[in-house]
Amino acid sequence: MKYPKQIRTYCPFCKRHTIHKVEKVKKRPRSELSAGQRRFRRKLKGYTGFPRPNPAGREKPVKKLDLRFRCTVCGKAHTRGQGFRVKKFELVEV
């Protein structure tokens, strides 16, 4: 899917329609020191199996896109609804 790099949309911070830059957010590595991750690692120790139901077969083939719209006037970014599923995504100049 081709999506424009700049789009004119409503800015909830300026409270008016302005030009926004569209940016695709990259997934960051998960923190190994978070409380949930430490609990999970403790659970994996020993002679046990996987502590949760196996997600194979239930997971979706494609993740949802995380798009941020950054206002060129105030510089703040916001999302617009939920993401959508798409295999190929490309930002293009219009």
Swiss-Prot record:
The keyword Glycoprotein does not apply. A zinc finger (C4-type) spans 11-74. GO terms for molecular function: large ribosomal subunit rRNA binding; structural constituent of ribosome; zinc ion binding. Pfam families: Ribosomal_L44 (PF00935). Keywords: Metal-binding, Ribonucleoprotein, Ribosomal protein, RNA-binding, rRNA-binding, Zinc, Zinc-finger. Disulfide bonds: none annotated. Binds 1 zinc ion per subunit. SUPFAM superfamilies: Zn-binding ribosomal proteins (SSF57829). Zn(2+) binds at residues 11, 14, 71, 74. One of its GO terms (cellular component) is cytosolic large ribosomal subunit. InterPro entries: Ribosomal_eL44, Ribosomal_LSU_eL42, Ribosomal_zn-bd. Belongs to the eukaryotic ribosomal protein eL42 family. NCBIfam families: PRK05767.1. Part of the 50S ribosomal subunit. Binds to the 23S rRNA. This is Large ribosomal subunit protein eL42. It comes from Thermococcus kodakarensis (strain ATCC BAA-918 / JCM 12380 / KOD1) (Pyrococcus kodakaraensis (strain KOD1)). The gene is rpl44e.
